[in-house]
Amino acid sequence: DPEMSRGLGDVYKRQMKRIAIAALSAVILQGVTPLDSLNVYASENTGASYTALDLYTYIQDQCSTEYTLTEKAETFLEEHDDLFPASTELVIPDEMIDAELDFRHINKNPSRYGDKLMRISDAYVIQVQEEEIEEGHYLTWLNLIDGEEQQYSVYYNGELDDVFEDDTVEVTGLPLGTSSFENTEGGDTLVVVLAGCRVNNID
């Protein structure tokens, strides 16, 4: 019954929202300034004056969910600049995606990962923000929670015109590391940080 499915979907979203708000204080991009200091290698993929590796190296200690790039992630970003972001025409080979990889693996030992992409299905968008980091080039940040109530911080090198707060998305991205932030209850919320490769609104 489509009506019942829609109703259950709304209940699920409200539940996710409640969990997220209970655990989360406002998190925003902080101090991300134009990347004037980088301009070393232009990206053929985006036309920006910085590559994906430049970007994710630069923002790791400039963003609200600070992280430390793993060596494997650095290598992957350098070798696959065309995936960040991936155009709609680009087919991502199955062997580049670890279908078994999830939050638990990365949280346990981030340094073991970053040489393959991961996919998060049915992730709920808690927050989404966009920041201009070079004239005409934007960074989009998404704070997501999945069905297991695990949270992700996704930095997407570009604009996501059809993705908004309260939407449900499927994300393909590269695990860069882990981070945490203080939640409203005084504890720490752990997040896995991803470089967004592709983000699809599935609502």
Q: What residue spans do the PLM features occupy?
A:
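Compositionally biased regions
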Residues: 3-6, 26, 38, 44
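Single conserved hydrophobic/aromatic residue that forms the stacking wall/gate
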Residues: 1-15
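OB-fold and OB-like single-stranded nucleic-acid-recognition modules
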Residues: 41-203
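Sec-dependent N-terminal signal peptides of Gram-positive bacterial secreted proteins and lipoproteins
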Residues: 14-40
